[in-house]
């Protein structure tokens, strides 16, 4: 979107917000004595740390005065969803709340969707990153995307340079070819230095998200909206051999933990992948942009860098997985009009830029993503955000268990890979049916 288009969209949003605030009574024009007009108090819940965002959320918008107050409350990620359910049941929930994609469908009944008459599909798509398209439902927009936390490839610079490897791999094929150089074994055959943590579930951080990323790289959306609700696409398409593309993906994932394969680099006896990387014994770690400072704090002496995730050779698309943090409005808000106005103002470039700086992860608008920061880490994060996608996971905890069983059953040969996928698909289908009502 060029500068002129950006200005037009900003003007449109400004007039929309102005109308919302006048209608709600936040901007009380021509009726100073009317005490029944909405107070403009807006309560926001989210898991973003208060130390980095509270002041910004509460004080950065025009009109933040005694008649218009915003309060941000940080919630524990482990209890956030349950707290939302209990609060809404008592009519004590927030007016606005911030969700990652794996919480949207579970909370769909609480969300007020922004109608396309207020913010058209075209304007939404021209304003926000491609991956935000999952927020566009048939009957409106779930909410406004604020930040994206993309998956990236962290790599140990010393381990690569020791083997004469100048650049990190750009494709999975290139990664395969490096296993002979980067995997080191003891005399008894145990792995002392690993190339990458793939092929297991229990000790691979973000295993479900990595599998999701591989699916997205194959251009499979995982879940899509239909006329009857949301449907699973795990088994969409067939290969020349008659199997699902997802079967090939799972087999690819498992090769890294198969001792009979040249790519063997990981097994269940090894430490957690994050711990292995920060101890200097893992060449590549697939993690989130938000893990950067944690890596630095655990091992300040670790010589590492970051780049985009390897892609599938021959595909005409580039994808990584990302957590898109979205601010949504509650159907039960007693101050819905004001809440919607506040949420839309949080899409202003100045606000999103500062929020991105505070959190050290990328914003979601095309205009801001096109202006990469000078910091090399953040520049890679912005590159990754541009290709970042996600899916509307109907139940994060349930699907995590289902994916774990799928991988564990395949490794133990309790089920073939195809059978394990069939079982997982059926289980997720049942969850989606409940979600669809």
Language-model regions, residue ranges each:
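C-terminal capping/gating helix-and-loop segments adjacent to ligand/active sites or protein-protein/ligand interfaces
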Residues: 6, 72-73, 136, 320-321, ...
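Glycine-centered hinge/linker elements that transmit conformational signals in sensory
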Residues: 178-180, 225-267
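Extracytoplasmic/periplasmic substrate-recognition and gating elements
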Residues: 64-66, 71, 139, 239, ...
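A structural signal for short loop-to-beta-strand junctions that line the ligand-binding cleft
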Residues: 86, 94-95, 120-160, 316-319, ...
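Mature extracytoplasmic/periplasmic domains
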Residues: 34-36, 51, 290-294, 325-398, ...
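Extracytoplasmic/periplasmic solute-binding protein
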Residues: 142, 146, 151, 176-235
């Amino acid at each position: 979107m060029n500068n002129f288009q950006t200005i037009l969209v900003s003007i449109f949003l400004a007039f929309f917000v102005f109308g919302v605030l006048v209608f709600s009574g936040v901007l009380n024009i021509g009726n100073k004595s009317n005490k029944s007009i909405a107070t403009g108090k807006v309560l926001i819940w989210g898991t973003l740390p208060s130390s980095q965002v509270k002041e910004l959320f509460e004080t950065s918008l025009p009109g933040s005065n005694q008649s218009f107050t915003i309060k941000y409350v940080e919630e524990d990620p482990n209890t956030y969803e349950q707290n939302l359910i209990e609060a809404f049941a008592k009519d004590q929930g927030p007016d606005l709340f911030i969700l990652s994609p794996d919480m949207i469908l579970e909370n769909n009944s609480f969300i007020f969707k922004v109608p396309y008459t207020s913010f058209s599909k075209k304007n939404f798509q021209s304003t926000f990153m491609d991956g935000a398209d999952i927020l566009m439902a048939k009957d409106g927009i779930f909410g406004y995307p604020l930040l994206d936390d993309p998956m990236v490839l962290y790599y140990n610079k010393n381990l690569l340079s020791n083997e004469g490897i100048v650049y990190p791999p750009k494709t999975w094929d290139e990664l395969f070819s490096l296993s002979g150089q980067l995997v080191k074994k003891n005399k008894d055959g145990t792995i002392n230095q690993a190339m990458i943590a793939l092929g297991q579930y229990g000790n691979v951080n973000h295993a479900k998200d990595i599998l999701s990323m591989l699916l997205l790289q194959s251009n499979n959306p995982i879940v899509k909206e239909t006329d009857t609700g949301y449907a699973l696409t795990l088994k969409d398409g067939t290969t020349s051999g008659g199997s699902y593309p997802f079967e090939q993906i799972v087999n690819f994932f498992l090769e890294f933990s198969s001792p009979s394969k040249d790519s063997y680099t990981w097994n269940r006896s090894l430490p957690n992948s994050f711990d292995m990387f920060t101890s200097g014994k893992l060449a590549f770690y697939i993690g989130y942009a938000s893990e950067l400072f944690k890596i630095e704090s655990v091992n300040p002496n670790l010589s590492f860098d970051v780049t985009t995730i390897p892609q599938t050779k021959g595909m005409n698309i580039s994808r990584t997985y990302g957590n898109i943090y979205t601010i949504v409005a509650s159907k039960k808000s007693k101050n819905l009009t004001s809440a919607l106005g506040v949420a839309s103002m949080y899409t202003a470039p100045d606000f999103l830029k500062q929020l991105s700086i505070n959190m050290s992860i990328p914003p979601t608008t095309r205009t801001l993503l096109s202006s990469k920061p000078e910091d090399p880490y953040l520049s890679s994060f912005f590159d990754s955000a541009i290709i970042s996608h996600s899916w509307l996971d109907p139940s994060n905890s349930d699907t995590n268990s289902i994916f774990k069983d799928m991988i564990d059953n395949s490794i133990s040969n309790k089920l073939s890979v195809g059978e394990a996928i069939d079982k997982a698909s059926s289980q997720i289908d049942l969850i989606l049916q409940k979600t669809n009502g």
